[in-house]
C-alpha cells in the first residue's frame, strides 16, 4: 500500500516506473501519473513524472520547463490546492508540485510543508511567491522578479549581503503575508496601483502607516486581522529595477 511520509512516497518494493497513479490535473481533468524516477537531493525527494490524459496514448512531463531547467521534477506534498490558492487536506490525496512552481519553491526556500510546524509558513510563502495579495489565487508577479523573504522566527533570515544575484540596498519592503494573502503591503511587485488592489478585493484593506520595524512600513493593511498573524515578509526590487534574471534563495 502506498504511503506518504514527510514528502516521500513509500511502498513495499516500490520502484520508479512500476506504478501508475490515478489523479487530476490542475484543471480537474482526470489523468494517469507515472513515476519515472526518484532522487534524494537537499533533504527532499524529487520525482520525474509523466502524465497521460484520458483517451490519449501520449505520456508527457506536466511540469513546464524554463531556460534553466529543461526537465523539471516534482515534489510530493500532502494536501491539494484549489483555484484560489488555498490548501485543503483531502484524505488519501497529495499534490505533485513542479519544482518551478510556488509550492515546491517554498519548500526549497526552507518551509517544508510536511512539517506541521511549518504548514502555515509554507502556505504564506506560496501567497508571497505568487504575489497573491487578495488571497484569491490571482498572481501579481512575473518571471525573474528578484525577491528576498524572511520571517523573523529564525527559519529564513533576511539577506543583508551583497551578492552577484542580489543587492539589499536596491530592495525595498513589499508586503507581509499570512496563509490567506497579504497582511499588509507597501507597494505591488508589478507596480499595479494600490487603489486597483483595493478594488480587486473590496473591504479587505484600508490605508495604513503600520511600522513593522527595520524599515518595513505598510501603506495598506488588513481591516480585520485579529485572527491572523503575519508570518512572512518580503522585499523585492521595485519594477524599474528588475534587471537581473534571478531570484535570491
Place the predicted regions along the sequence by residue:
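Long, compositionally biased low-complexity segments
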Residues: 2-249
Amino acid at each position: 500500500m502506498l504511503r506518504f511520509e514527510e514528502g516521500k512516497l513509500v511502498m513495499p518494493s516500490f520502484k520508479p516506473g512500476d506504478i501508475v497513479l490515478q489523479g487530476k490535473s490542475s484543471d480537474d481533468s482526470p489523468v494517469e501519473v507515472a513515476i519515472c524516477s526518484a532522487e534524494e537531493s537537499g533533504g527532499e525527494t524529487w520525482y520525474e513524472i509523466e502524465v497521460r490524459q484520458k483517451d490519449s496514448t501520449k505520456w508527457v512531463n506536466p511540469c513546464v520547463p524554463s531556460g534553466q531547467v529543461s526537465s523539471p521534477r516534482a515534489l510530493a506534498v500532502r494536501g491539494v490546492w484549489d483555484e484560489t490558492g488555498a490548501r485543503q487536506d483531502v484524505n488519501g490525496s497529495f499534490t505533485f508540485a513542479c519544482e518551478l512552481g510556488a509550492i515546491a519553491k517554498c519548500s526549497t526556500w526552507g518551509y517544508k510543508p510536511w512539517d506541521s510546524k511549518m504548514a502555515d509558513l509554507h502556505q504564506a510563502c506560496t501567497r508571497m511567491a505568487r504575489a497573491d495579495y487578495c488571497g484569491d489565487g490571482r498572481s501579481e508577479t512575473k518571471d525573474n522578479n528578484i525577491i528576498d523573504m524572511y520571517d523573523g522566527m529564525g527559519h529564513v533570515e533576511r539577506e543583508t549581503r551583497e551578492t552577484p544575484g542580489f543587492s539589499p540596498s536596491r530592495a525595498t519592503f513589499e508586503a507581509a503575508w499570512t496563509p490567506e494573502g497579504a497582511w499588509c503591503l507597501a507597494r505591488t511587485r508589478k507596480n499595479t496601483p494600490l487603489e486597483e488592489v483595493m478594488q480587486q478585493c473590496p473591504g479587505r484593506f484600508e490605508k495604513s502607516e503600520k511600522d513593522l520595524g527595520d524599515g518595513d512600513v505598510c501603506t495598506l493593511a488588513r481591516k480585520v486581522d485579529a485572527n491572523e498573524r503575519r508570518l512572512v515578509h518580503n522585499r523585492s526590487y521595485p519594477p524599474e529595477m528588475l534587471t537581473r534574471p534571478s531570484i535570491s534563495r
